[in-house]
Amino acid sequence: MNIKNILSERVSAAMVAAGLPEGTNPAISLSNRPQFGDYQANGVMGAAKKLKTNPRELATKVVAELDLDGIASKIELAGPGFINIHLDESWLAAQLNEVAQDDFIGVAQRGTTPGDESQTVVVDYSAPNLAKEMHVGHLRSTIIGDAVVRALEFRGDKVIRQNHMGDWGTQFGMLIAHLSDKLASDEVAETALADLENFYREAKVRFDNEEGFADRARADVVKLQSGDEACAKLWQQFIDISITHSEEIYAKLNVSLKRSDIMGESAYNDDLSTVVDELMAKKIAEESQGAKVVFINEMANKDGEAPVFIVQKSGGGFLYATTDLSACRYRSGKLAANRIIIFTDARQALHFKQVEIVARKAGLLPENVGYQHCPFGMMMGDDGKPFKTRTGGTIKLAELLDESIVRAAALIKEKNPDITDTDLTEISKKVGIGAVKFADLSKNRTSDYIFDWKTMLSFEGATAPYLQYAYSRIQSIFSKAGTVKNDAVINIIEPQEKALALKLLQLEDVVDAVISECTPNLLCNYLYELASLYMSFYEACPILKEGISGEVKASRLALCNVVADTLKQGLDILGIETMERM
């Protein structure tokens, strides 16, 4: 159910009938104020300018041809040529009654409408470096990517998750050398690697300061890359323990990534020399000071100086660039992706722009495959600097999430002193984790944001606790009513009911925008607006009050049910859990 699409088709047909060229954009948008209608068609203004004609006269012709019988109760001209559309309450109620019976709450599934076929979408997100614990810097890629993945799947696309973990590189040489020494002193690997962050720090200190250790580390890198069994065995221990740690974080975050989604950097090793050979054979890459590089002329500055994109170092080693080119080939070829989406912080935007240019030129990424790098801003402390511990250290993601649960538990206990320990444990986890996720997801993806415990854990405003409370409040009404009639007919009588119906029927449009722009904040905004409209409806339209007719009560309970389903589904797309009571 997409009102915007329905109106676009009708207004477009009227524009053609009024003599405008086919394909003229009707520019349908939601009205900001109810007195100007529910939707507006503003396309006549732009069309009149191109045709050098009077916009109001043109709009009058369009309105004369516009067939919205049974859909709109009133169509009116406003200003120089805007068309205001007031939707009929009976039509809205009919649409909402269909939505109430639909498993997908009115969101059409791919393949059910001509021209809206399911796509294969590869999504690269989270991608922590192994041999280190996940820190707060990994939060955004992990949860933004997961929200977009869930939105794609809800719409009916085939999604292939790719967790491009950093499981390769020169740092593993020093880690293997340090672990080898630990094991030689009879320490078991699990004990030595219990604190990955501390282990990494110890190895780095030895690499920087201990005579002979750096040489051993470099030698171990060569051995690892040459397939040495002993080094490979130690490397695998790092990988296994690191992945287990990441899986614990994903479970706590309610993120859908699984071990089977991992496609680490090492998975592309066998293809890297082939990629470079192809680039050289096609004269795309060339030798420069012993290295093999691509001069990206498409990005040359005003002096004609092109950026240098290194694909193989002078010593023979490969880089992230080479791995990312190989990934383009694998994802567009082996995985048959129609679209590739990558979530990393904004500092890598230039790198991925260069990767796309080189990959397309080399034929590693066909022109008909979409390639979308989605950069995001940073999480900042209240001092406006990157979020750190008080001593300036990196905050472990596990510790941040644990703190969110503790803080949520204190707030819930304060509001409900009689809550059982079992309920407190379950609810505080959902509220605490949900608060952290919503605070992040509700911000514009490309913007930095200030991390603030007080705001995110508030039960007022655009927060997860507010939305979770709205959902549980509806469940409380159902409990008091003793029944929920899903098949009851919804009637729209009061303005608050109409406002709620209009918002509910916008879900597909919002989900499509999230999918297109990879911006979960649009869904966060929608859910907050929906919950706010529900609260207004609840205050103005009694449901269980004595004297309310059975028909009105059933209608309003059915309306509540659609709101509850929409809140639950929307929060599920964001990876945030709901509860029946708080």
Swiss-Prot record:
UniProt catalytic activity? tRNA(Arg) + L-arginine + ATP = L-arginyl-tRNA(Arg) + AMP + diphosphate
What keywords are assigned to this protein?
Answer: Aminoacyl-tRNA synthetase, ATP-binding, Cytoplasm, Ligase, Nucleotide-binding, Protein biosynthesis
Q: Which InterPro entries match?
A: aa-tRNA-synth_I_CS (IPR001412), Arg-tRNA-ligase (IPR001278), Arg-tRNA-synth_N (IPR005148), Arg-tRNA-synth_N_sf (IPR036695), ArgRS_core (IPR035684), DALR_anticod-bd (IPR008909), Rossmann-like_a/b/a_fold (IPR014729), tRNAsynth_Ia_anticodon-bd (IPR009080)
Family assignment? Belongs to the class-I aminoacyl-tRNA synthetase family.
- Documented EC number(s): 6.1.1.19
This protein's species is Colwellia psychrerythraea (strain 34H / ATCC BAA-681)
- Could you tell me where this protein is found in the cell? Cytoplasm
Listed GO molecular functions? arginine-tRNA ligase activity; ATP binding
'HIGH' region (motif): residue ranges: 128-138
Q: Known Pfam families for this protein?
A: Arg_tRNA_synt_N (PF03485), DALR_1 (PF05746), tRNA-synt_1d (PF00750)
Q: Name one GO biological process term.
A: arginyl-tRNA aminoacylation
Query: What is the protein named?
Result: Arginine--tRNA ligase
Q: Name one GO cellular component term.
A: cytoplasm
Specify the enzyme's EC class, one word: ligase
Q: Which superkingdom heads the taxonomic lineage of this protein's source?
A: Bacteria
Under PROSITE patterns, the record lists: AA_TRNA_LIGASE_I
The protein's assembly and partners? Monomer.
Q: Gene of origin?
A: argS
Main localization category: cytoplasm
